[in-house]
Structure formats: C-alpha cells, structure tokens
C-alpha cells in the first residue's frame, strides 16, 4: 500500500503547480509515509484527502502562459510551516495565475518566530518563482503572512 501511495503522490506532485493548496492537501498523506511502519494507518481523513487530490487533478483551474515582457506578481502566505503561493501577471485589469506554489519550511525554520518564518518563506517562494520565470528579475512581491 505504501508503494502505491508513493506513486500516487509522485504523479500528483508532478502536477502540483496546477493545484491550489497542494502542500496542505498532501501533507497528511506524506506524513503517513514517514517512519518504518509497515501499515499506513489509513483512516477516513486519509480517504477524504486522497479523494480531494484525485479531484484536484481533474478540475485544475486554467493557467496562462507567462509573458516575459510583463512584471510578475508573487502572492504567498506561510502557516504552520507550509508556504502556499500564486505566481501571476496582470492581463488588463485581471490578475491571471501562472502557477500555484507550495513548499514546506525545513525543520529548523518551522521553529522560528513568525517574522523569521515569513523571511524564510519569502526566500523559498522567490527561488521557486525564478525557476518558472526563467530568472526574469522583474517580480513584484506581495507578501501576506
């Protein structure tokens, strides 16, 4: 069962930039894979999360292709060690999403005060955004913590 769950999370993880809040959704299932236990301890909560991830793959929102001539906007927040973000660009009067981002802070950073976790989250999200923007340096940061 662990092998199948790892495969499912790997496939889903490949599509994570199209799934808003992926990190929060998948966190419980990743925690079930930790340790040397043979059994997963599958319960109703795991089933709900699993089904939500399956549903998210089939109903992902439409994302736009980036225009490297325009400024990018990065919105994100950090809660309980998970950073969730959205990279987008203004298309007329509408902010159009390009990617949804999610990252876990490392164990050390999770213990920091809120203000320092926000700094660590900023560094993580900017690093992820640069991968998707091909290193274009015109990114407008909007930080929400």
List where the protein language model places each region.
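Mobile genetic element proteins and their domesticated derivatives, centered on retroelements
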Residues: 5, 9-10, 29, 53, ...
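A short, polar/acidic, helix/strand-boundary loop motif
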Residues: 91-120, 124, 144-145
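C-terminal reverse transcriptase regions that engage the nucleic-acid substrate
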Residues: 1-70, 145
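Two-metal-ion RNase H-like nuclease active-site motif
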Residues: 70-79
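Flexible loop/turn segments at secondary-structure boundaries
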Residues: 15, 81-84, 93-94, 107-108
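Conserved helix-loop functional segments at active or binding sites
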Residues: 55-63, 106, 127-131
């Amino acid at each position: 069962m662990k092998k199948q769950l790892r495969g499912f999370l790997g496939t889903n993880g490949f599509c994570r930039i199209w799934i808003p809040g992926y990190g929060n959704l998948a966190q419980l299932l990743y925690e079930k894979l930790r340790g040397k236990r043979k059994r997963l301890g599958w319960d109703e909560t795991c089933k709900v999360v699993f089904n939500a991830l399956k549903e998210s793959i089939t109903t992902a929102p439409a994302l736009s292709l980036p225009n490297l001539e325009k400024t990018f906007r990065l919105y994100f927040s950090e809660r309980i060690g998970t950073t969730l973000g959205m990279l987008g660009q203004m298309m007329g009067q509408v902010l159009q999403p390009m990617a949804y981002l999610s990252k876990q802070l490392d164990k050390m950073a999770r213990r920091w005060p809120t203000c320092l976790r926000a700094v660590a989250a900023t560094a993580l999200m900017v690093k992820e955004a640069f991968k998707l923007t091909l290193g274009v340096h015109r990114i407008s940061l909007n930080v929400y913590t």
